[in-house]
Regions:
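Acidic, polar-rich low-complexity tracts and alpha-helical solenoid repeat scaffolds
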Residues: 1-137
């Protein structure tokens, strides 16, 4: 957990769910992590922990091999939080999810969107490498 999230978590009513979710993520118990982070989404949607919780839900689905659900959750994050500090990572993971689903068209579109984002330098490099590997149809 980063310092900003730790500070927010200590004051937030959803902090106990956030901590339990992070602990479950670290332990590789992704279904439990999803449940804990979802409690924040449902009970405290305006919480400062809502944004990182959304990211961790999406990431937990990805890590658990549930790529369709991951795509939906990463997309939800980018729609709900268009200026998210997790935007670049989310677009990359969404593109990776599409690749895992063998959806080359949506993978390419997502990775191109990421590649053209000037604020995502590290992730743009990864996106460009993935685009090269996808080739052209």
């Amino acid at each position: 957990m980063d310092e900003m999230a730790a500070t927010q978590a200590s004051k937030d009513p959803g902090a106990k769910f956030y901590r339990k979710g992070l602990d479950a993520m670290k332990a590789g118990n992704y279904p439990v992590a999803i449940v804990q982070f979802a409690k924040i989404q449902h009970s405290y949607p305006k919480s400062p922990l809502s944004e990182p919780s959304q990211y961790f839900i999406a990431n937990a689905f990805y890590e658990n091999g549930k790529y369709e659900q991951a795509v939906l959750q990463f997309n939800d994050l980018t729609m709900r939080f268009p200026n998210s500090r997790f935007l670049c990572e989310s677009l990359l993971r969404e593109g990776q999810s599409f690749v895992r689903l063998n959806d080359r068209i949506d993978a390419r579109l997502t990775l191109q969107k990421l590649s053209s984002n000037n604020n995502c330098s590290d992730e743009s490099v990864a996106a460009n490498n993935m685009l090269k590997n996808l080739g052209s149809d």
